[in-house]
Amino acid sequence: MAEIHTMHNTKAGRVFDVCNILFLGGVGAITILPFLYIIAGSFATEAELAQRSFFIFPKTFTLDAYKYVFSTPTFLRSMGVSIFITVVGTAVQLFFTFTMAYPLAKRHVKGRNLLLNLVIFSMLFSGGMIPTYLVVKSLGLLDTYWALILPMAINPFNLIIIKNFFQQLPRELEESAKIDGCSEIGVFWRIALPLSKPVIATFALFYAVGIWNDFFHALLYINDSAKWPLQMVLRQVTILSDLTATNGDTMQNAVPPEQGIKLAVIVIATLPILAVYPFLQKHFAKGMLIGSVKG
């Protein structure tokens, strides 16, 4: 400790600290500035966007792009659909992934290796888009919310990571719980899951971001526009704004600027995830270290 303290008090140590701060500050600026530009652009006018005459703050503040997006008839309904799919889909994925990973982590479970090999096989060789579509259709899931949830219920890669985490839990905890009369299911619910809070928070964030940003599965399985998630509606808004701009209606002030709508759509689609992250941050940092340290 004394050597470390002395190093930081030397000239070389202070130079290193300054360079480290400048480097990390530069990386932070490179990361944050694009987001600030997008936010500022969503509030800028058409002329400013065309001339790129703003940086962090627009010269003329306008809400036209947001008014146009929020005035879309299906916007609020699609927002509710996305929230429902994200919450339910995340819960379903966490439930199936953890309940499958726990028995796979137990060496005494019969057929464990066969099932694990099937999981790895499905990760390396997926069924493909058309076969998956035919399965969804045969199950009667087309044009239902479950078509956006059940086909992605288990992620093989995440399953293997969580299985490895359960294998690292001390066996003494399980043995002590069983001595106290706890069943295998009781050990899972009362011992393994409470110790898995950082893991649950980490994968909940991963699953939620994936479901929230997904529009491809809705494009495949949902034909009813009343059941479109937010990403599909925002995609349609962007396409319509492109068509309107191509026809020259934007110059007649029929709609807000094409680029402004796109930037507003990015902000709207990103804000919910940014709002959730601070609440999971303390668990997220721990969960990222899954499997990196043993003992």
From Swiss-Prot:
Predominant localisation class: membrane
Membrane topology note: Multi-pass membrane protein
UniProt keyword annotations, A-Z: Cell membrane, Membrane, Transmembrane, Transmembrane helix, Transport
Coiled-coil residue spans: none
Gene Ontology, cellular component aspect: plasma membrane
InterPro entries, A to Z: MetI-like, MetI-like_sf
The protein, known as: Protein LplC
Source organism (scientific name): Bacillus subtilis (strain 168)
